[in-house]
Design a protein with these regions (language model features):
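Phosphate/dinucleotide-binding and metal-coordinating scaffold of catalytic cores
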Residues: 1-304, 308-437
Length: 437
């Protein structure tokens, strides 16, 4: 296992990871290399579960994979590409070895300590037109021209199920997110996500930078990589340093989705930030704001791999990364729940959101003020953000139930309710009626 130390553009041998299959799942064992431990600038890859020390670290969680290794592994999309192009690996470790180039964070892997990971160049924006058809074909199980391997193979390690490709220009790396055959044909997911980035920024929430482009009739969302920094070499070419990354799942030491349970907990994550964050007070407040925002906009896919932390410049601690993967989900039942536990449960009600505000170092009054401000900002701006992202009036009406009703709608509903009470001859409480209580 290799790591890119702060500012470095080449990996340093960090240690050895073995994963053995067992009847119960798997056992993972990791040992830091003595050469790594002897370096004054060595950094722990997980300060909680893998502190810098000699000796063996072991785990049986997640089939014997430490969370930081799961974060660096390909997800549904990448695994599917690897299976299609190279055949299914004999073990999950094979996915770590066969995915190259674009994995999130600063870890990398090879088969032996004297064989550094392959550093493949990334394609530029000029491949995007061809990529629309290529990735659509891969999603349908069609193998592509072997000549395209040089830009498909380095793009298998990023998480999620959507077709994607990491590209690079002279200044930044971008994660290009493509349409999926599973998308609603009437709504552009790229435009939806771009609109929510803008809406979150209206609410004072830090988000990833994104750019919406159209290529060959397809909407693509380019998301700037927050874990890569361009470094100019002496020959004028661009190399890339890499920053460490951990998901909320790793911070929470969770094994992921379990039947009849939530995929993480916002209050629990806030409490764990004390050990992980370089600035826990600021990160807890930001996390609370994101929790409120996700509840208010019906982003119910806010599971613990859709929140991340990136190492600070010195690699000494972590900070919340910019918010990402936010899309409203049209409710299908009257009872709405978030993927992560919000307060006492996962319901996105104001009372529940405020029920564990002390975990975020906030008073009830402070938490209530943040909630009400975000709700009002969303109510006032969501249609404008949809419009600026090129979403139609029909799309707005389709997703209107995801957002707080306008004040006009609230007042109209109140008037209708009041009239119904009068017409029904309700003899109950006189509160709220002319001349009443």
């Amino acid at each position: 296992m290799w790591v890119y130390l702060p500012g470095d553009v080449h990996p340093t041998l960090c240690g050895r990871f073995n994963n053995d299959r067992t009847a119960a799942g798997g056992v993972g064992k990791f040992v830091y290399a003595k050469s790594y431990l002897s370096q004054s600038h060595a950094r722990s890859i997980d300060p909680v579960l893998l502190p810098l020390r000699d000796g063996e670290h072991s785990t049986t969680a997640q089939l014997g994979f430490f969370g930081v290794f799961v974060d660096a592994s390909p997800d549904d999309w990448g695994r599917g590409v690897i299976d299609l192009m190279y055949g299914k690996p004999d073990s999950p470790v094979g996915y770590l070895l066969r995915s190259q180039g674009d994995r999130v964070g600063n870890l990398d892997f090879s088969e032996a300590p004297d064989v550094p990971p392959v550093q493949r160049g990334l394609p530029g924006r000029d491949v995007l037109k061809a990529a629309v058809g290529v990735l659509a074909g891969i999603e349908r199980g069609r193998k592509e021209d072997p000549s395209l391997e040089n830009w498909v193979r380095p793009n298998t390690a990023m998480g999620g199920a959507r077709p994607k490709l990491t590209i690079a220009d002279e200044a930044f790396q971008w994660l290009a997110k493509f349409p999926s055959r599973h998308d609603d044909p009437e709504v552009s997911v790229a435009r939806l996500e771009h609109a929510l980035h803008a809406l979150a920024r209206h609410c004072g929430i830090e988000t990833v930078d994104s750019e919406l482009i159209m290529v060959d009739g397809a909407d693509l969302l380019l998301v700037k990589r927050f874990d890569r920094t361009a470094v100019k070499k002496e020959d004028g070419l661009t190399a890339w340093s890499r920053d460490g990354f951990v998901s909320a799942r790793t911070v929470l030491r969770s094994s992921g989705v379990n039947e009849n349970s939530y995929t993480g907990s916002y209050p629990g994550l806030a409490r764990d930030l004390t050990r992980w964050s370089a600035k826990p007070v600021a990160d807890k407040r930001e996390l609370f704001s994101r929790m409120v925002f996700n509840c208010v906009v019906s982003n119910t896919d806010d599971h613990d791999r859709n929140h991340g932390f990136v190492a600070d410049e010195m690699g000494e601690g972590f900070r919340l990364s910019g918010a990402y993967d936010m899309v409203p989900r049209i409710p299908t039942t009257q009872r709405r729940v978030q993927a992560m536990r919000v307060g006492d449960d996962a319901q996105p009600t104001r009372d529940n959101i405020l029920s564990e505000c002390e975990s975020f170092d906030l008073s009830k009054a402070q938490a209530g003020e943040i909630h009400d401000s975000i709700q009002a900002t969303v109510r006032q701006n969501w249609r404008e953000c949809f419009d600026h992202s090129g979403l139609s009036e029909a799309a707005m009406e389709k997703f209107a139930s995801c957002f707080p009703p306008s004040l006009k709608q609230v007042l109209s509903q109140a008037v209708r309710t009041g009239l119904a009470d009068v017409e029904g001859g309700d003899s109950g409480s006189q509160e709220g009626r002319p001349g009443g209580g």
